[in-house]
């Protein structure tokens, strides 16, 4: 029986290292790795990609596009962890929980784009509500998110953790030009007709995301209530292994959101906070930016693709 060969192009970056750690020791696949001296050799990388059953690209956007262009073996399947192909026609979006058919689309695909960290939480909250008609596609959305500094990649981790490093600011807001590259991804896969505002920031901790989206009930159609929104999310994610929707009554009793609560896992926790008196609702998501927001999602997609590959020979 053929053992699938998996090659991680960019296995020394933050996401690549995490994927490698998650796959190491598995007997159902063979990890193809290049010697350190050959990792940046274009010819050796091209040979490795074209000899793999599945290639995981953990590269900057331009390098990911070049890697895909270098594939001449039609049997090679790709999971791209960069943002290069997340809105590209012909690529399947790698969020298995997007709808009932998405996991099967991923399983059968030859080109899968791994979701961005922030979009994972935003789309998971918004897509079911827009699809159900509870949230207008042109709602003037404001998305707020704080991530650990590992969201800035390997250079950011080294900058914060090297000996003698200056103390990091408690919070660093960025993307203030309102042109963050994740916005088109969020808009397309959440089904939005109006561009949302997105305000990200890095906290002085290593990893974990807390994302929130405020809603005014008076701007929703008909008599949509917090209970309607809650029921929609619960129904959409019923049976989802890696997505947990917190009960509404528990949310009301919670004092805060801990962005580090799910670190090390591939889980996503959604919660809805409501104040009926003020007619306001807060949608929230907590997850590991290196887990469900990156490497965990990539391995989840890989497992879906391996299942299809093994089932079909």
UniProtKB/Swiss-Prot annotation:
It comes from the Bacteria. One of its GO terms (biological process) is L-arginine biosynthetic process. Disulfide bonds: none annotated. It holds the Pfam family Semialdhyde_dh. GO terms for cellular component: cytoplasm. Keywords: Amino-acid biosynthesis, Arginine biosynthesis, Cytoplasm, NADP, Oxidoreductase. It is found in: Cytoplasm. InterPro entries: AGPR_AS, AGPR_type-2, NAD(P)-bd_dom_sf, NAGSA_dehydrogenase, Semialdehyde_DH_NAD-bd. Its main location: cytoplasm. Pathway: Amino-acid biosynthesis; L-arginine biosynthesis; N(2)-acetyl-L-ornithine from L-glutamate: step 3/4. The active site is at 117. It catalyses: N-acetyl-L-glutamate 5-semialdehyde + phosphate + NADP(+) = N-acetyl-L-glutamyl 5-phosphate + NADPH + H(+). Catalyzes the NADPH-dependent reduction of N-acetyl-5-glutamyl phosphate to yield N-acetyl-L-glutamate 5-semialdehyde. HAMAP family: ArgC_type2 (MF_01110). NCBIfam families: argC_other. This is N-acetyl-gamma-glutamyl-phosphate reductase 2.
